[in-house]
């Protein structure tokens, strides 16, 4: 098994900053935006984007934490630990996750969102898009496009959970 670091902490910070600038440019009414991080690492990325938006625009956007486990199509979990402090009805919700792969996580996140309210618009921001979709889903904001083979794995580490910021690719062969 081979592991290769493909994004270091500095590059990750730049990617998050780039996503933040794109959010500012594409959303004329930032005061109508709600950030929704997908647990676990998507929540920490959402907090970093929220912090950058505050630094750049002086805005304190609301942020929620989406638990997709109860909405997945491959397992059943009863407890939903979603935290959404604001009504998302009529809001522009930006889903935030670490890796976009098959699209199934995002489908589950959208199912969770519509159970909470009826957003005006839903867009998607991801740190890494690795391809290999099984569903017709694409990201609106992408930090890094990293094409992979189907046997490779992308591992995102964030300092809040893993003690460091980096993205690695693991080749099991």
From Swiss-Prot:
Q: What is its EC number?
A: 2.4.2.9
Q: Where is this motif: PRPP-binding?
A: 93-105
Q: What class of enzyme is it?
A: transferase
UniProt xrefs under Pfam families: Pribosyltran
- Which GO terms are recorded in the biological process aspect for this UniProt protein? DNA-templated transcription termination
Among CDD domains, the record links this protein to: PRTases_typeI
Q: Which residues bind substrate?
A: 40-41, 97-105, 130
> What HAMAP family has UniProt attached to this entry?
PyrR
- The protein here is known as Bifunctional protein PyrR
Organism name: Streptococcus pyogenes serotype M3 (strain ATCC BAA-595 / MGAS315)
């Amino acid at each position: 098994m081979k592991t290769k670091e493909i994004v270091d902490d500095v590059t990750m910070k730049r990617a998050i900053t780039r996503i933040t600038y794109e959010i500012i440019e594409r959303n004329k009414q930032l005061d109508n935006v709600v950030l929704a991080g997908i647990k676990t690492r998507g929540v920490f990325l959402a907090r970093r984007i929220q912090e950058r938006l505050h630094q750049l625009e002086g805005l304190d956007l609301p942020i929620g934490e989406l638990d997709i486990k109860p909405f997945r199509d491959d397992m059943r979990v009863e407890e939903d630990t979603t935290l959404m402090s604001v009504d998302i009805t009529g809001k522009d919700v930006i889903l935030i996750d670490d890796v976009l792969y098959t699209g199934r996580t995002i489908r589950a996140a959208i199912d969770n969102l519509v159970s909470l309210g009826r957003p005006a618009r839903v867009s998607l921001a991801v740190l890494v898009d690795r391809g290999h979709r099984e569903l017709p889903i694409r990201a609106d904001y992408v930090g890094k496009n990293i094409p992979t083979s189907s046997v490779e794995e992308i591992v995102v580490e964030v300092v809040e959970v893993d003690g460091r910021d980096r993205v690695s690719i693991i080749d099991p062969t």
